[in-house]
């Protein structure tokens, strides 16, 4: 009951302020010059994934840990707070690897410093914290949030901000957006295998209150001349996929239409049972896989019945355009 009340309050907040925040979707366009700082830099996760980001040649320029300010970690400076880190490094993005109890405050600290792109990997952030964050987020137009509870965002062969395996990515022409982390990797691997590669891959996360949705990413993909096709991976719960379908119906048509392939997880999920992600639940008869699949197909999207068919379905969709 409390979760439903929180959800209703968040939706009310969204409607009035969303347009102001929506202008920040361009902050998703990361590249080889994007400067990244790490919040929770010296912790176990921050260290491990910070190393991997550096190995991918991401421009990590420092990190934040108030208790170790003034020292170095992984050969990079550690700052007292995000504001100091941004002032001294000119950071364009921040990635957050801090425990759930402190993650909401970490996002707000990055917002206070007006970091253009904030990627929060942390899972299990209390919903009440995220409602507070979302309320603040929608009232400003400087910071774009990806996540929480997500694998991050990657511009293939240029910049990796998150926990995704870099080696499966290859520069190419497919834009990928997904609520599921592991299914994102499946789509990436398949598009690499069939020779398409990727432009930008965004894991938007599986929580009910996230900073970036399907439509934000579709905006980027449809405007980007390098992106020739789109893969959208959804799951049960909420109405994000139906809203994305309506957006595609209106904005992706005619001679310049880009092929879109989708997979929806949770076809056999029983109503009322949460399936992994906090937002993956059929509630009140809404958010079923069937509703989402029908809406997407009506918008001209090719919906596969298995994630193993994403690559071949995209190849077939391209052949249909020739």
UniProtKB/Swiss-Prot annotation:
One of its GO terms (molecular function) is succinate-CoA ligase (ADP-forming) activity. It comes from the Eukaryota. It is an enzyme of class 6 (ligase). GO terms for cellular component: mitochondrion; succinate-CoA ligase complex (ADP-forming). InterPro entries: Cit_synth/succinyl-CoA_lig_AS, Citrt_syn/SCS-alpha_CS, CoA-bd, CoA_lig_alpha, NAD(P)-bd_dom_sf, SUCC_ACL_C, Succinyl-CoA_synth-like. Residues 1-21 form a transit peptide. Its EC number is 6.2.1.4, 6.2.1.5. Pathway: Carbohydrate metabolism; tricarboxylic acid cycle; succinate from succinyl-CoA (ligase route): step 1/1. Keywords: Ligase, Mitochondrion, Nucleotide-binding, Transit peptide, Tricarboxylic acid cycle. The active site is at 277 (tele-phosphohistidine intermediate). Pfam families: CoA_binding (PF02629), Ligase_CoA (PF00549). CoA binds at residues 42-45, 68, 121-123. It is found in: Mitochondrion. Substrate binds at residue 185. GO terms for biological process: tricarboxylic acid cycle. It catalyses: succinate + ATP + CoA = succinyl-CoA + ADP + phosphate; GTP + succinate + CoA = succinyl-CoA + GDP + phosphate. Succinyl-CoA synthetase functions in the citric acid cycle (TCA), coupling the hydrolysis of succinyl-CoA to the synthesis of either ATP or GTP and thus represents the only step of substrate-level phosphorylation in the TCA. The alpha subunit of the enzyme binds the substrates coenzyme A and phosphate, while succinate binding and specificity for either ATP or GTP is provided by different beta subunits. Belongs to the succinate/malate CoA ligase alpha subunit family. Heterodimer of an alpha and a beta subunit. Different beta subunits determine nucleotide specificity. Together with an ATP-specific beta subunit, forms an ADP-forming succinyl-CoA synthetase (A-SCS). Together with a GTP-specific beta subunit forms a GDP-forming succinyl-CoA synthetase (G-SCS). HAMAP family: Succ_CoA_alpha. This is Succinate--CoA ligase [ADP/GDP-forming] subunit alpha, mitochondrial. It comes from Caenorhabditis elegans. The lineage of its organism: Eukaryota, Metazoa, Ecdysozoa, Nematoda, Chromadorea. The gene is sucl-1.
């Amino acid at each position: 009951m409390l979760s439903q009340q929180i959800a209703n309050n968040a939706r009310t907040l969204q409607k009035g302020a969303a347009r102001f925040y929506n202008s920040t979707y361009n902050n998703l366009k990361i590249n080889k010059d994007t400067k990244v700082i790490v919040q929770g830099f010296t912790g176990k996760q921050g260290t491990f994934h910070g190393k991997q980001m550096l190995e991918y040649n991401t421009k990590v320029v420092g990190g934040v840990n108030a208790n170790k300010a003034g020292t170095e970690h992984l050969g990079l400076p550690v700052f007292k707070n995000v504001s100091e880190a941004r002032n001294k490094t000119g950071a364009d993005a921040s990635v957050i690897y801090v425990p759930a109890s402190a993650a909401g405050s970490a996002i707000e600290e990055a917002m206070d410093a007006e970091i253009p792109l904030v990627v929060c990997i942390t899972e299990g952030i209390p919903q009440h914290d995220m409602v507070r964050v979302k309320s603040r987020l929608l009232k400003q137009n400087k910071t774009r949030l990806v996540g929480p509870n997500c694998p991050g965002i990657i511009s293939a062969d240029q910049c990796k901000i998150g926990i995704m395996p870099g080696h499966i990515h290859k520069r190419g022409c497919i834009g990928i957006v997904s609520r599921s982390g592991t299914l994102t990797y499946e789509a990436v691997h398949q598009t690499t295998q069939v020779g398409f590669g990727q432009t930008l891959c965004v894991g938007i996360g599986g929580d009910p209150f996230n900073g970036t949705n399907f439509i934000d990413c579709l905006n980027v993909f449809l405007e980007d001349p390098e992106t020739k096709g789109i893969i959208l991976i959804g799951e049960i719960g909420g109405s994000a996929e139906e809203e994305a379908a309506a957006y595609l119906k209106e904005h992706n048509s005619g001679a310049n239409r880009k092929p879109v392939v989708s997979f929806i997880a949770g076809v056999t999920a029983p109503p009322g049972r949460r399936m992994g992600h906090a937002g993956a639940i059929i509630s009140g008869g809404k958010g079923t896989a069937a509703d989402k699949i029908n809406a997407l197909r009506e918008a001209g999207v090719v919906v596969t019945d298995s994630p193993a068919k994403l690559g071949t379905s995209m190849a077939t969709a391209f052949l249909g355009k020739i």
